[in-house]
Swiss-Prot record:
HAMAP family: Ribosomal_bL31_2. InterPro entries: Ribosomal_bL28/bL31-like_sf, Ribosomal_bL31, Ribosomal_bL31_B, Ribosomal_bL31_sf. This is Large ribosomal subunit protein bL31B. One of its GO terms (cellular component) is ribonucleoprotein complex. Keywords: Ribonucleoprotein, Ribosomal protein. It comes from Xanthomonas oryzae pv. oryzae (strain KACC10331 / KXO85). The keyword Amino-acid biosynthesis does not apply.
Length: 80
């Protein structure tokens, strides 16, 4: 493998600001912000607006929003 070709892969903390969930993982992303983790070390902090901790699909709080009766119209058209 060639030297200096691959990105720097290191430990980072992802922070879901919606649910205040933090996870320590590895990534090539960088950040000027740092956070002190449970092990006492400081890691780069990557803030995200949505993750599996707050996304409706993963939390089970998914809602179907019917705009203008489109679902009813579809069901009437294709009802058997």
């Amino acid at each position: 493998m060639k030297d200096n070709v691959h990105p720097n892969y290191k430990d980072v903390v992802f922070h879901d600001v919606t649910s205040d969930f933090k996870i320590l993982t590895r990534s090539t992303m960088t950040s000027k912000e740092t956070v002190k983790w449970e092990d006492g070390q400081e890691y780069p902090l990557i803030k995200v607006e949505i993750s599996s901790s707050s996304h409706p699909f993963y939390t089970g709080k998914h809602k179907v929003i019917d705009t203008g009766g489109r679902i009813d119209k579809f069901q009437k058209r294709y009802a058997r």
